[in-house]
Amino acid sequence: MRRPVLLLSIALLIPACNGGTVDQHALKNDSDAIDSLACEGALLAHQVVDGATTEPFTRVHAGELATRASNFQDALSQRPTTPGIESAVRTEAEKAGRVADLLHQLEANDADSAAELKGRLKQEGDCA
């Protein structure tokens, strides 16, 4: 009896995981999350430049951030949208892809390129 209830619970939760139709509110939330990933990546790049982080930490953390950005890219590229915002949603998907690419580059932990990546991530995320 517990197994069918568990399966039903999982089936009900799956659509809530970055699924469904993208409306203006969801687009704003996803956009803010993508900006946050870019800004967090910029902070990590700053630590690399300053020598304030280790290579394993940078590799793992940048990889996790890149995966999350890639997930937004995939979801926003495929999900249906409410009328009138499809272009904005697809543009945000492209931005998420750019952020993911930059974060993958940061995984290499190259201090020379980290300074450039920091600037590009700050620009993508419109970081303060």
What are these regions (language model features)?
Residues 13-16:
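C-terminal motif of bacterial Sec signal peptides marking the signal peptidase cleavage site
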